[in-house]
Amino acid sequence: MWEIFWSDIAQDCGKGLLAGGASLAIQCVAPRLGRLLKHIRARWAGRKHGHLDTTAPVPRLKRRLAAIFATDVVGYSRLTEVDEEDTHGRLKTCWTEVIDPTIQRHRGRIVKNTGDGALVEFVSVVDAVRCAIEVQRVMAVRNTTVPQDRRIEFRVGVNLGDVIVEPNDIYGDGVNVAARLEGLAAPGGICVSADAWHCVRGKVAAQVVDLGPQRLKNLAEPAHVYAIPPAVGTT
């Protein structure tokens, strides 16, 4: 609509300029501009009195089905309180040497990195769970030479759900469930929603514990949860 309107304005203005200069050009476009102002006033009056303009197009939210992987460092505040610089350096090394390359190998996309955690999107839920398992196994091996109170351990939650897509973020219940599952996981462990697990069952090599329905924070209904216990070497 607006492209046509401004095109007409330009044409009228051009005709006026060719016919008689600037003053005639203004006379040519004045009627169209007057109608535009009248339209704007009418819409403003409707908003002012609480009336919605049902003719105005409502922008649609972009949505898609995605496998969501949420992770966080266990006891990060405690670790930084003991030695902030050492913790930051070791965590940065974990991201560079373990987590980032593992996510890339499994075709994941890091949506958000909070420093001590991340939100990652996968097209395949099988890739998401395999990535989580690999990260936890590698971290378990690295932690065998680290004192227990200084270990960097992750919790991971994986969900399959519908998400709202923004240019640099994703939102919605699918993301919220993944974050709550992460909080339910044991240090070094993984919690997976039933929707996600039904897609990966028989496709990943891992011991799985059926936790049954679990109450997740700020979610009205219990969610059926499956847990992949910590790999050997974690606490």
Which residues does each PLM region occupy?
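Short, Lys/Arg-enriched, Gly/Pro-containing loop segments at transmembrane-helix junctions
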Residues: 35-47
